[in-house]
């Protein structure tokens, strides 16, 4: 009799994706982040669902409903802080996952990579709208500032902003629609994840060497299921440490003040995971230029396959490119720091230099050094 795992129409899909999937034997812990992102998405959907049972998307009661969740709902504080800090964990895993893809040349799987970029944009949109829902000062002013950026689009900008707001300012209509979008987007993300995996399984996984590994594949289960479970336990440990010991570490104190359209906070800034893009936005004095730089700071990932001039896929054996990659990483940390600083000297010039360096490394230095490495290896 045939094994049900291999014959049942539904179970065999799961079997080919997570059990009998041929996997390169040498993939390192950097390949754990895909499964961790799946776990993060699951945690966010579950905690979000329970929060939505008690939350009210009305300007008069939104802030109070969040307070009610934390004070009166059974384990409400735990659910709320797991959701808020779960978003931070989600982005840490996302950045590491993208960084892994850049380092080991995984962007050469073009369809998988492009779906990944769409996923990154969707997750960022979801997180932004979720931040608005608690209706604190930073939520309100963050929503006002970020949605206002669309007014930089020539001709249709102002109309577009008012259409998104559902009025002439961020108000009840905005909050209600943001709640609607914030609820539906994670399910769209889950669907995109399936497409992402579908394209990945067409080609098979990349590996640290960047070489073809068809001759040395092992089944995903039990080897990588156990490895992923270890990663998951570490993720949960880190998340719960953050939630139970310092849940407000990554939040903004201003968000404990109810939204007030008549009082602007001295420094408007988004959550930490958007600070690098916010720093790039602020580094350009022109509004439209800033918005374009903001979009291209992430969209630039899409042209990485075009800029691959090296004869080796991975950076594993390319010390010059490795050096550049870590300079780029340090530059992103610098941008994140600058994004949280006030707009004054010397932060303005540091932000501008860091932004120039970010685009220069990706567009100029990485391709140039790749060609140089080819020459040095006499290829």
Swiss-Prot record:
**Localization, UniProt:** Mitochondrion inner membrane
Q: Which UniProt keywords apply?
A: Electron transport, Heme, Iron, Membrane, Metal-binding, Mitochondrion, Mitochondrion inner membrane, Respiratory chain, Transmembrane, Transmembrane helix, Transport, Ubiquinone
One example of the protein's molecular function in GO is: metal ion binding
GO cellular component labels: mitochondrial inner membrane; respiratory chain complex III
| Main subcellular localisation | mitochondrion
**Cited PANTHER family:** CYTOCHROME B
Subunit info here reads: The cytochrome bc1 complex contains 11 subunits: 3 respiratory subunits (MT-CYB, CYC1 and UQCRFS1), 2 core proteins (UQCRC1 and UQCRC2) and 6 low-molecular weight proteins (UQCRH/QCR6, UQCRB/QCR7, UQCRQ/QCR8, UQCR10/QCR9, UQCR11/QCR10 and a cleavage product of UQCRFS1). This cytochrome bc1 complex then forms a dimer.
Q: What does this protein do?
A: Component of the ubiquinol-cytochrome c reductase complex (complex III or cytochrome b-c1 complex) that is part of the mitochondrial respiratory chain. The b-c1 complex mediates electron transfer from ubiquinol to cytochrome c. Contributes to the generation of a proton gradient across the mitochondrial membrane that is then used for ATP synthesis.
Name this protein carries in UniProt: Cytochrome b
What organism is this sequence from? Glis glis (Fat dormouse)
- What does UniProt list as this organism's lineage? Eukaryota, Metazoa, Chordata, Craniata, Vertebrata
Gene field: MT-CYB
């Amino acid at each position: 009799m045939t094994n049900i795992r291999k014959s049942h129409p539904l179970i065999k899909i799961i079997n080919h994706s997570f059990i009998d999937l041929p996997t390169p034997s040498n993939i390192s812990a950097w390949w754990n982040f895909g499964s961790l992102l799946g776990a993060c998405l699951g945690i966010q959907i579950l905690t979000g669902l329970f929060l939505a049972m008690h939350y009210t998307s009305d300007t008069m009661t939104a802030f109070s409903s969040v307070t009610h969740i934390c004070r009166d709902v059974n384990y409400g504080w735990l659910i709320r802080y797991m959701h808020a800090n779960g978003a931070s964990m989600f982005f840490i895993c996302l950045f590491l996952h993208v960084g892994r893809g850049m380092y080991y040349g995984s962007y050469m799987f073009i369809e998988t990579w492009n779906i990944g970029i769409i996923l990154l944009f969707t997750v960022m949109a979801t997180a932004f709208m979720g931040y608005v829902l608690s209706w604190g000062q930073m939520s309100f002013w963050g929503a006002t500032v970020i949605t206002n950026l669309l007014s930089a689009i020539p001709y249709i900008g102002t109309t577009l902003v008012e259409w998104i707001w559902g009025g002439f300012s961020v108000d009840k209509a905005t909050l209600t629609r943001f709640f609607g979008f914030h609820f539906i987007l994670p399910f769209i993300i889950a669907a995109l994840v399936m497409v992402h995996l579908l394209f990945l399984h067409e080609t098979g996984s990349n590996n640290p060497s960047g070489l073809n590994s068809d001759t040395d594949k092992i089944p995903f289960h039990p080897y990588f299921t156990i490895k992923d479970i270890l990663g998951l336990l570490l993720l949960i440990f880190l998340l719960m440490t953050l939630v139970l010991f310092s849940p407000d570490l990554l939040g903004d104190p201003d968000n404990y003040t109810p939204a007030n359209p008549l009082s602007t906070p001295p420094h408007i800034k988004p959550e930490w995971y958007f600070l690098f893009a916010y720093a790039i936005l602020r580094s350009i004095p022109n509004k439209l230029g800033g918005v374009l730089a903001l979009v291209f700071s992430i969209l630039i990932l899409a042209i990485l396959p075009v800029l691959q001039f090296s004869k080796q896929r991975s950076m594993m054996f390319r010390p010059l490119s490795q050096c550049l990659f870590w300079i780029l990483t340090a530059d992103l940390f610098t941008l994140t720091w600058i994004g949280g600083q006030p707009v004054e000297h010397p932060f303005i010039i540091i932000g501008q230099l860091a932004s120039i360096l970010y685009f220069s490394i990706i567009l100029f230095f990485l391709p140039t050094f790749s060609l140089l490495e080819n020459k040095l290896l006499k290829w």
